[in-house]
Amino acid sequence: MARFELQKLYIDGGYVDASNTETFDSINPANGEVLAKIQRASKEDVERAVVAAEKGQKIWAAMTAVERSRILRRAVDILRERNDELAALETLDTGKAISETRYVDIVTGADVLEYYAGLVPAIEGEQIPLRDSSFVYTRREPLGVVAGIGAWNYPIQIALWKSAPALAAGNAMIFKPSEVTSLTTLKLAEIYTEAGVPNGVFNVLTGSGREVGTWITEHPRIEKVSFTGGTDTGKKVMASASSSSLKEVTMELGGKSPLIVFDDADLDRAADIAMMANFYSSGQVCTNGTRVFVPNALKGEFEAKILERVKRIRPGNPEDENINFGPLVSFEHMESVLGYIAKGKEQGARLLCGGDRLTGGVFDKGAFVAATVFTDCTDEMTIVREEIFGPVMSILGYDTEDEVVRRANDTDFGLAAGIVTRDLNRAHRVIHLLEAGICWINAWGESAAQMPVGGYKQSGVGRENGISSLAQYTRIKSVQIELGDYASVF
C-alpha cells in the first residue's frame, strides 16, 4: 500500500482527476517503497490546462507589477515556512540526503523566486527619439502560456527556476515534472495558489515525457517551452516545439565537464573541489566536473588525497541527518550507472575505489552505488566521452597547458568547466579559452540567482536565472508615434 494518497493533476487552482484511469508509481529509491500512485495526464488534460492557463494569464498580466511582486514574495515566505516538510518529501522521492535537501534544494529555489519577485517592477520598455516630431516606444509584454519540463534530480528547484521568471513576467505556466520525481512540484502548485497566484497561472501535469511532454511541446497555443534533461530528448523537444508553432525554447541539457588542476594548485583544495564536483547528490548533477585533468607529475599525490576524502563519504538512509550520500534516483538509473562502470573496467581504466553496487543491511533494498574513481583514463574511453550522471570520477593526466585546453574542449558538450590555480593571469586566460557556459575558478557548483546558467554546444540553448532569463519570457512590441504632419506619396 502506498504511503501517500492518490496524487492528482493540478489544473486551474486545484486538484482534479485525470480524464483517464491510468496511474504510475512514485518509488523511494532508498528502499523500493511505493510512495504514491500518481495520475497520468491525457491529451485532453493538456487542453484543459491550456484553457485554464489562458484564462488565468489574462488576470495575472492585468495586475500591476507591484501586485504580482507581492504575491510572489508571499510564495517565497510559504516555501521557507514549509522548508523542512518539503525537504523531507524531496528526500523520499529522489533519495537525496536530507542534509542536502533541507539546506539547498528548497532554499535555493526560494532564493530564485525572491530574486525575480524583486525584478517584476523593473520590467520596462524604452523610448527612442527619431526626430522632433516622432519617437518610438517599446513594451515588454508576456508571451502568454508557457511550459516547463523538468528533470528528476532537482524537482522543486527546477520548477522554481522555470516558473519564477515566467510568472514574474506575467505569463502562465504548465509544468510537467519528471515521471520519476513528481511529488514536490505538486506541493509548489499548492503554495502558489495559497500565496494568491490566480487560478490557472501554474498548472502541473504528471506523466511521461514521451506522451505528456510531447503533447505539451506540440500544442499550438503554448508560446515557449523550457526543458531540462538529456541532450537526445532535448533535440526532440526542440524539433517538436519549432515544427508545431515556432515556439521559443530554452534548453538546459547534458554535460561532461572538465575540471583542470594546474601544477601550482593547492592540491588539498583541488581534491575538495573534485569531490564536490563528482559526488555531491551522489553524482547526479548536470554540471558535474567528471573529467578531472591533473598534471602527470602530481597525479599520484592527487589520487592519494582523493582516496583519503572518499573515506569521509557516509552512505546510507538519506533520511538520517548524518548521511551525506544517498541512493541513485531509481533502480533503472542504477543499472545504467553500473553499466558505465563496467565499460570503464573493460576499456582499461584503473579502478582506484568503488566500482560496485553497495550491498548489505540498509543497502540491499536501495539503489546504492559506491563512489567510484577511475584513473589512467584516456580521452576515447566511454566513461570519458558520455554523460554518466552518477558517482563516477575519471582522472586524466596531462603535461602542458595547451594540451589540456585542447582536450578539455574535445567534447560535444559545453555546460560547465573549472580550473584550480594560484595564478590569476593563467586562470582568466584559460577560462577564456574553455568552451563552456558556466565556469568556476578555485570553486565548483554554486549557481546564485543572479548568475545566468546554460551551456555551449549540445549542452543547451538560452539561459536560466539572471536578468537575461526574465527578458526571455517577454516579447517586445515597438510603437511609433508621429506628432507632425504625415506625408503620403499618393
UniProtKB/Swiss-Prot annotation:
EC number(s) recorded for this UniProt protein: 1.2.1.8
Site (Seems to be a necessary countercharge to the potassium cations): 248
Catalysed reaction equations from the record: betaine aldehyde + NAD(+) + H2O = glycine betaine + NADH + 2 H(+)
Record-listed NAD(+) binding positions: 150-152, 176-179, 230-233, 254, 286, 387
Residues carrying Cysteine sulfenic acid (-SOH): 286
A biological process term (GO) from this entry: glycine betaine biosynthetic process from choline
CDD domains, sorted: ALDH_F9_TMBADH (cd07090)
Source superkingdom: Bacteria
Binding-site positions, K(+) 1: 26-27, 93, 180
Cofactor comment: Binds 2 potassium ions per subunit.
Record pathway: Amine and polyamine biosynthesis; betaine biosynthesis via choline pathway; betaine from betaine aldehyde: step 1/1
One MF term in the entry's GO annotations: betaine-aldehyde dehydrogenase (NAD+) activity
Coiled-coil ranges per UniProt: none
Cofactor: K(+)
Residues annotated as the enzyme's active site: 162, 252, 286, 464
Binding site for K(+) 2: 246, 457, 460
Top EC class of this enzyme: oxidoreductase
Function, as annotated: Involved in the biosynthesis of the osmoprotectant glycine betaine. Catalyzes the irreversible oxidation of betaine aldehyde to the corresponding acid.
Assigned protein family: Belongs to the aldehyde dehydrogenase family.
Subunit structure comment from the entry: Dimer of dimers.
Protein name: Betaine aldehyde dehydrogenase
Organism of this sequence: Pseudomonas syringae pv. tomato (strain ATCC BAA-871 / DC3000)
Organism classification: Bacteria, Pseudomonadati, Pseudomonadota, Gammaproteobacteria, Pseudomonadales
